[in-house]
């Protein structure tokens, strides 16, 4: 069947080089942000049925609040959000926060307490909905609008709660001994550390305070010494047997040991093992099989063991020896003397089981629970005398109180996994068994069993996304509020109050505001282009509150870890101090409910790879063998090779194919979005790939976006998910299109309550956060049928729904007169003339008229002492016209400020009396264009305070806005009418009427002609016999009226908002914002780059005729230095050049075939050529089935150059590139003969020429160049400020002074240190001298010297300057320096 190109030929078709089929759908790229915040707010969930997560959990954890006496209680019932006051665009324009009011329903219960029995009965219940401040909402693109600017909350990586075992790598002690430690980290609450010291005693620390023996902690948990030993050691019973002792034979404790003396069977008396023989597992097994039960031992064998129980005389209660005491001759004598013939002994052999806990117990000074509790109390609260109650309460609150200690579900799950427990994840506090299990495992580690944890493993680090960060912040706010509520409940007459009176929501609202405004993780969105937006939202930062700091973070934390595979990109991270601390999520990764990053894998069942996709976190993945995505498969999904490269437990290895459990989904699941946009990434060195992915984020949107010839197939995904290109919300037919909006009549999803019309407003020349230009252009035409998700309009840096960050430029790699030395870039003038790399930047200027002490400032056109020429661009209100061309120093908004009265001379008074006052008491404070900025005014916004009269300009802007809203309403109304009346006439047709408008005959059969005789508004008067149809007519009428009134209401609300005054900062009467569009052509000093980290600065722009040219006379656009490739090892750019050259060659052929088709009407050669280019493969089939119109459209798209996609790690190889070159009729060396543009002579050797996708980066020379004459000075030091933003000067710094000193240039030096810097009096004198035409001046004392003197005085040194003039005689007496 002939296929048509998707809905309007406005979708780029690419030849696809990938060989690995895409099995899993790539998740939405900003899912991380949206899902997390939705889970926090749960707006969609019904009020009563919300699960205990997010905001619900916060309220549940703080409420109910009981007053101190227990006489009343405030309970939480539910919460809901009201619709936000302003929509996203209004908030952007008015500098507001996009937020919805949060209403919480609270229930106040008052109790009657019986004074005798203390029994409570409910006296009164009151319920009320209370306003709890505004909660910021997330926009559809995953951002927040705070005070009118878009911000992003970056996700934070932090150490997961749970238990971690580690050692100090032998650094703590000089012997290099490994000291093991365990740390229990809760989500909130006290940290518990358990650690060994160099003497192998086990200590515990709480919150990194002073250490106490771990046995004290165990005693505080209610254990005694014997119980502690019983928990950690096994017991053996030594029985008296004649002269010696019988000891049980336990082969498991003897493995690998040596028999020091001969071993004798206690039952038979025979020697079973000779002295000095090694006890191998085989030998021990033979002895067990022979039936050896017990060995004979002498007294010597008992010495050095420890008692497992107290040795007590039960009749008198006398304790001879305590559990844990060492057995030596003396103790043995005591035991035998008192007639004990059985001795319980601890199973400590110092080889497999160490005596650490026993040694700790004997070193511990605390004897019982009370001592231990007191000791812990003294550590936690030094200086306070402990009592049993206070000590017990404090100890319980540390780890066992859910209010203060929360492991979180994650912590509990991690703890269960590490310690082999199975506790419900609702148990969020520690238990005695948990602490025991931690100590046991730590001791086992010291005994050499088990492994320590790898803290950088992604199984031990988790992500806190927006929702969770917000939840923690809101909890803090509510806890602050809780204290105030409790106090108020106690102090107020509780019977008469409502919940509203108890609550002051300020702390909660302030916590939210503080988080969005000043948290380290709430960042100003990087909005240079769509890619930088998406990357910013997918960023993971290890910094921030509760995270690492740059200075403390070592090498290991920053390094790439095997578990990053498929979860965090190994390439994209900043260069500089943050390297490795700020990462990017990989393309297919997602964050699970516990906050761990998961990556998708295909299941392998019975040796065959299925399309069943499974998401696993790093912990879960460790046990599987995972094959690479590029492993070769047979048609049935089995592996071709006997041995397959795979990953297992962090190692890469070759393993037999039968052992495989999983397989990667796609080769690009390893890298981030930005890295996946680099073609031939696999041929680039990692350092350059890092620069390439970072520099794509800095590419400025150009005037004309152009998609790359050589892409990777990721481009449409980024354009769609970033929200730069507009996608259709639902299917429909395009009804109207102009530059500012698209109106679509919906054909699907037509619910009763929903409007049947979608209006898409396009952003025109809006300013982004980085001053780049956001502009959207429609792609559809009237009558187009669109489906859901189709691209309707291109945005900044998008071209037919593909991301387009730069332009395809014809590049030659060759030196050119030294102009491409050190990575400089040589450009052709054509690039400037054709606006290839021209971008538009929008600057915003705002001016406020305040109410000052001396009177209000005024925005006006009559400014004192300003010529009419300077006011030519201002309207009668004193505000610049839209479309005016402005340059540095031009007035944008005229403003005058009243100035203080100065005393007048009698003459002035006379003149004032004669000519009237006014002119002199104001000064000009107009807003002017800053130096170095030229541009065109594109937008002006005027904001007035409530009750301040609006000027002409404000009224005009308001009228325009209302007209726009009215047009939207009318269009929607027209489409509604057309739909409804169309359906109405269909229903009436063929029916017999029983009533109708005036003058209508009953019983007539209705037809189009009959009905059309009457005006539309009267059609509702027809009634028909068929009752079913009649009821449908009535339902339609109701639906129509409801839609109409809803439309009108929406319009009225918006108009009311427009006409209402604006919220203003205190003291501001009026505010004007002026937006200036600046057109920046490329010029020497601008920074450019390719996608492979090949960056450089434009050194010169050469006339076209001087540039090297090809045999057909085409001049190259860019000349790059060939020496930039070998040492940098980014060979991807060369492959891109060749492939781009082939694409352009094919494009030329297609262009010629289009001309041929126009001449002879035969489309077959064109179809064949396009078929040859596309080749075979899954993505190619649809192109082969295109109808003629679609083939022509595609050819038109491809005539400048064929679009191809070469996915990362699965792209075109050298053979493919050669095939493409041959297909295009070019040499497969990819080189061409070039001629020198200036002499016309041929260059000696062939030159590599081709197309590279070049980007212009947001480092423009216009933003950096800066000059200053007189400007602002620092108040204290009186030296000029620094930097362009402050209009500062160049610093003649310390090293420059040394240079002058070295040259002995005394006068220049004096000048630099005084009159040209901070000698205030000297500066004025120089100025006066220059004005007089005199060139003598005197240097005084620099201000910085005075500052130094003041600082010395502040340190208590009396420094005085003697101001004496020397006369001739004294001067001659001074010692001569030359002597």
Curated annotation (Swiss-Prot):
Disulfide bonds: none annotated. CDD domains: RNA_pol_B_RPB2 (cd00653). GO terms for biological process: DNA-templated transcription. GO terms for cellular component: DNA-directed RNA polymerase complex. DNA-dependent RNA polymerase catalyzes the transcription of DNA into RNA using the four ribonucleoside triphosphates as substrates. HAMAP family: RNApol_bact_RpoB. It catalyses: RNA(n) + a ribonucleoside 5'-triphosphate = RNA(n+1) + diphosphate. NCBIfam families: PRK00405.1, rpoB. The RNAP catalytic core consists of 2 alpha, 1 beta, 1 beta' and 1 omega subunit. When a sigma factor is associated with the core the holoenzyme is formed, which can initiate transcription. GO terms for molecular function: DNA binding; DNA-directed RNA polymerase activity; ribonucleoside binding. The keyword Transmembrane does not apply. This is DNA-directed RNA polymerase subunit beta. Belongs to the RNA polymerase beta chain family. Pfam families: RNA_pol_Rpb2_1, RNA_pol_Rpb2_2, RNA_pol_Rpb2_3, RNA_pol_Rpb2_45, RNA_pol_Rpb2_6, RNA_pol_Rpb2_7. The gene is rpoB. InterPro entries: DNA-dir_RNA_pol_bsu_ext_1_sf, DNA-dir_RNA_pol_bsu_external_1, DNA-dir_RNA_pol_su2, DNA-dir_RNAP_su2_dom, DNA-dir_RNAP_su2_hyb_sf, RNA_pol_bsu_bac, RNA_pol_bsu_CS, RNA_pol_bsu_protrusion. It comes from Rhizobium etli (strain ATCC 51251 / DSM 11541 / JCM 21823 / NBRC 15573 / CFN 42). Its EC number is 2.7.7.6. Transmembrane segments: none annotated. Keywords: DNA-directed RNA polymerase, Nucleotidyltransferase, Transcription, Transferase.
């Amino acid at each position: 069947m002939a296929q048509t190109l998707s809905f309007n030929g406005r979708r780029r078709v690419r030849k696809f080089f990938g060989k690995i089929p895409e099995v899993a759908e790539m998740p939405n790229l900003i899912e991380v942000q949206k899902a997390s915040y939705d889970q926090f707010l749960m707006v969609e969930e019904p009020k009563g049925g919300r699960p205990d997560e997010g905001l619900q959990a916060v309220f549940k954890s703080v409420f109910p609040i009981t007053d101190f006496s227990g006489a009343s209680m405030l309970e939480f019932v539910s919460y809901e959000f009201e619709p936000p006051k302003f929509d996203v665009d209004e908030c952007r324009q008015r500098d507001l926060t996009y937020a919805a009011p949060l209403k919480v329903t609270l229930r106040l219960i008052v109790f009657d307490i019986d004074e005798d029995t203390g029994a409570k009965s409910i006296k009164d219940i009151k319920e009320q909905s209370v306003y709890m401040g505004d909660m910021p909402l997330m926009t559809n693109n995953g951002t927040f609008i705070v005070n009118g600017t878009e911000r992003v909350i970056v996700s934070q990586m932090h150490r997961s709660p749970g238990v971690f075992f580690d050692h100090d790598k032998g650094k703590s002690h000089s012997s290099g001994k490994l000291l093991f430690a365990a740390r229990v980290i809760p989500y909130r609450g006290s940290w518990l550390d358990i650690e060994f010291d160099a003497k192998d005693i086990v200590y515990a620390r709480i919150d990194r305070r002073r250490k106490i023996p771990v046995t004290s902690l165990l005693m505080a948990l209610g254990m005694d010494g014997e119980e502690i030993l019983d928990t950690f050691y096994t017991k053996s019973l030594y029985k008296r047997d004649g002269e010696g002792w019988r000891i049980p034979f336990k082969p498991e404790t003897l493995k690998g040991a040596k028999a020091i003396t001969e071993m004798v069977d206690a039952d038979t008396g025979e020697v079973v093992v000779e002295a000095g023989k090694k006890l191998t597992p085989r030998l021990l097994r033979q002895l067990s099989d022979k039936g050896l039960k017990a060995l004979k031992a002498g007294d010597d064998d008992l010495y050095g063991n420890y008692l497992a129980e107290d040795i007590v005389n039960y009749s008198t209660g006398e304790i001879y020896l305590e559990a844990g005491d060492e057995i030596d001759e003396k103790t043995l004598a005591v035991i035998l003397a008192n007639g004990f013939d059985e001795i319980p002994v601890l199973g400590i052999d110092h080889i497999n089981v160490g005596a650490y806990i026993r040694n700790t117990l004997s070193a511990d000074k605390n004897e019982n629970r009370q001592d231990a509790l007191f000791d812990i109390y003294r550590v936690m609260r030094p200086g306070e005398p402990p009592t049993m109650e206070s000590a017990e309460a404090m100890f319980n609150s540390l780890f066992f109180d859910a209010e203060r200690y929360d492991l979180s579900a994650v912590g509990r799950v991690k703890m269960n996994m590490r310690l082999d427990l199975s506790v419900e994840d609702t148990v969020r506090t520690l238990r005695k068994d948990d602490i025991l299990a931690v100590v046991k495992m730590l001791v086992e580690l010291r005994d050499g069993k088990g492994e320590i944890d790898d803290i950088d493993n992604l199984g031990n680090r988790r992500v806190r996304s927006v929702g969770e960060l917000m939840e923690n912040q809101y909890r803090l706010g509510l806890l602050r509020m809780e204290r105030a509520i409790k106090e108020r409940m106690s102090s107020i007459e509780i019977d008469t109050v409502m919940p509203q009176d108890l609550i002051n929501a300020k702390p909660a609202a302030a916590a939210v505001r503080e988080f969005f405004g000043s948290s380290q993780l709430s960042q100003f969105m990087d909005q240079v282009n769509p890619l930088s937006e998406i990357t910013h939202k997918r960023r993971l930062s290890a910094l921030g509150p509760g995270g690492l700091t740059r200075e403390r973070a070592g090498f290991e934390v920053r390094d790439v870890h095997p578990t990053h595979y498929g979860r965090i990109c190994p390439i994209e991270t900043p260069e500089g101090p943050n390297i490795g601390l700020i990462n990017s999520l990989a393309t297919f990764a997602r964050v699970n409910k516990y906050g761990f990053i998961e990556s998708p894998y295909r299941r392998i069942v019975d040796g065959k790879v299925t399309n069943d996709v499974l998401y696993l976190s790093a912990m879960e993945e460790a046990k599987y063998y995972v094959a690479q995505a590029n492993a070769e498969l047979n048609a049935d999904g089995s592996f071709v090779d006997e041995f397959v490269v795979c990953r297992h437990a962090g190692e890469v290895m070759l393993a037999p194919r039968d052992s495989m459990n999983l397989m990667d989904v796609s080769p690009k699941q390893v890298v981030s979005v930005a890295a996946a946009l680099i073609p031939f990434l696999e041929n680039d060195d990692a350092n350059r790939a890092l620069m390439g992915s970072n520099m794509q984020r800095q590419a400025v949107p150009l005037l004309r976006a152009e998609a790359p010839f050589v892409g990777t197939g990721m481009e449409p995904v980024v354009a769609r998910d970033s929200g730069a290109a507009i996608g259709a919300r639902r299917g429909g037919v395009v009804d109207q299109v102009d530059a500012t909006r698209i109106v679509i009549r919906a054909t699907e999803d037509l619910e009763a309550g929903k409007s049947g019309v979608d209006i898409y407003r396009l952003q025109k020349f809006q300013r982004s956060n980085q001053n780049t230009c956001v502009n959207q252009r429609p792609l559809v035409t009237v009558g187009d049928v669109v489906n859901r998700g189709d691209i309707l309009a291109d945005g900044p840096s998008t071209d037919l729904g593909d991301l387009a960050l730069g332009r395809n430029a014809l590049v030659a790699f060759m030196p050119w007169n030294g102009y491409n030395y050190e990575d400089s870039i040589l450009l052709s003038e054509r690039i400037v003339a054709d606006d290839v790399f021209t971008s538009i930047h929008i600057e915003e200027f705002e001016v406020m008229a305040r109410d000052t002490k001396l009177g209000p400032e005024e925005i006006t056109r009559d400014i004192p002492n300003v010529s009419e020429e300077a006011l030519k661009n201002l309207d009668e209100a004193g505000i610049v016209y839209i479309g005016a061309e402005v340059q540095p120093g031009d007035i944008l908004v005229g403003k005058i400020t009243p100035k203080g009265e100065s005393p007048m001379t009698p003459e002035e008074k006379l003149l004032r009396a004669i000519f009237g006052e006014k002119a002199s008491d104001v000064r000009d404070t107009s807003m002017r264009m800053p130096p170095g900025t030229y541009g065109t005014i594109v937008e002006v916004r005027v904001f007035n305070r409530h009750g301040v009269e609006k000027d002409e300009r404000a009224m005009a802007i308001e009228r325009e806005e209302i007209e726009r809203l009215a047009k939207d309403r009318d269009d929607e109304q027209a489409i509604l009418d057309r739909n409804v009346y169309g359906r109405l006439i269909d229903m009436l047709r063929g029916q017999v009427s029983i009533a109708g408008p005036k003058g209508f005959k009953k019983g007539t059969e209705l037809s189009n002609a009959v009905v059309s005789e009457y005006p539309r508004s009267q059609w509702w008067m027809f009634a028909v016999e068929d009752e079913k149809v009649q009821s449908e007519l009535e339902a339609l009428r109701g639906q129509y009226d409801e839609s109409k009134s809803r439309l009108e209401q929406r319009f009225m609300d918006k108009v009311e908002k427009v006409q209402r005054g604006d919220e203003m900062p205190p003291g501001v009467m009026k505010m004007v914002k002026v937006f200036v569009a600046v057109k920046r052509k490329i010029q020497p000093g601008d920074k450019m780059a390719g996608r492979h980290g090949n960056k450089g600065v434009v050194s010169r722009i050469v006339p076209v005729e001087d540039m090297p040219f090809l045999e057909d006379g085409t001049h190259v656009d860019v000349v790059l230095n060939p020496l930039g490739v070998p040492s940098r090892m980014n060979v991807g750019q060369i492959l891109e050049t060749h492939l781009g050259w082939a694409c352009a060659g094919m494009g030329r052929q297609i262009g010629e075939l289009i001309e041929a088709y126009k001449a002879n009407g035969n489309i077959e050669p064109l179809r064949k050529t396009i078929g040859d280019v596309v080749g075979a493969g899954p993505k190619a089939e649809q192109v082969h089935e295109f109808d003629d119109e679609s083939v022509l459209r595609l050819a038109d798209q491809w005539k400048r150059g064929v679009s191809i996609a070469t996915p990362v790690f699965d792209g075109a190889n050298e053979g493919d590139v050669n095939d493409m070159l041959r297909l295009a009729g070019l040499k497969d060396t990819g080189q061409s003969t070039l001629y020198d543009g200036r002499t016309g002579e041929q260059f000696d050797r062939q030159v590599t020429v081709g197309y590279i996708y070049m980007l212009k980066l947001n480092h423009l020379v216009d933003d950096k160049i800066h000059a200053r004459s007189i400007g602002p000075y620092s108040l204290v030091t009186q030296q000029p400020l620094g930097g362009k933003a402050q209009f500062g000067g160049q610093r003649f710094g310390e090293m420059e002074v040394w240079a002058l000193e070295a040259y002995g240039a005394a006068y220049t030096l004096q000048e630099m240190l005084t009159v040209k810097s901070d000698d205030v009096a000297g500066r004025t004198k120089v100025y006066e001298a220059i004005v007089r035409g005199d060139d003598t001046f005197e240097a005084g004392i620099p201000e910085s010297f005075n500052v130094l003197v003041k600082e010395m005085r502040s340190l208590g040194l009396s420094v005085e300057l003697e101001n004496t003039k020397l006369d001739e005689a004294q001067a001659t007496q001074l010692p001569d320096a030359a002597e």
